[in-house]
Swiss-Prot record:
Assembly and interaction partners: The RNAP catalytic core consists of 2 alpha, 1 beta, 1 beta' and 1 omega subunit. When a sigma factor is associated with the core the holoenzyme is formed, which can initiate transcription.
NCBIfam families linked: rpoZ (TIGR00690)
Function: Promotes RNA polymerase assembly. Latches the N- and C-terminal regions of the beta' subunit thereby facilitating its interaction with the beta and alpha subunits.
Molecular function as annotated in GO: DNA binding; DNA-directed RNA polymerase activity
Keyword Transcription: yes
Protein name: DNA-directed RNA polymerase subunit omega
Keyword presence, Transmembrane: no
Keywords (A to Z) from UniProt: DNA-directed RNA polymerase, Nucleotidyltransferase, Transcription, Transferase
Gene3D superfamilies: 3.90.940.10
EC number in record: 2.7.7.6
Disordered: annotated span: 80-114
């Protein structure tokens, strides 16, 4: 197989920095066991990822969405209504904390300032 260069892929992903991010993400997917869309030909995962992009066997838009999804730490929930189970859980936690708190001293007795 001929060497894969950035010039082979730059017409599919015009920004070289995006190309690096997408191909690195795809190489990590391949390392994780994702199915190959081209023959390996004894190439390492980054080269296979670049070949997949160059031969258009995988869409850069799909890679971009997968990359963004893998980097998100919080999943945004479109549902604005509070979840009944989480509301009950918060109430139960508040009751547990209240029950575990030390008892208060009576209002006028036993204070440090008399």
């Amino acid at each position: 197989m001929a060497r894969v260069t950035v010039e082979d892929c730059v017409d599919k992903v015009p920004n070289r920095f995006d190309l690096v991010l997408l191909s690195a993400h795809r190489a990590r997917e391949i390392s994780g066991g994702s199915e190959l869309t081209v023959d390996r030909d004894r190439d390492k995962n980054p080269v296979v990822a670049l070949r997949e992009i160059a031969e258009q066997t995988i869409r850069p838009k799909d890679l971009h969405e997968a990359l963004v999804g893998s980097l998100q730490k919080v999943v945004i929930d479109d549902d604005d209504t509070p979840d009944e189970i989480s509301s009950i859980s918060r109430s139960a936690e508040a009751l547990r904390l209240t029950a575990a708190a030390p008892p208060r001293s009576p209002a006028g007795g036993g204070g440090d300032f008399e």
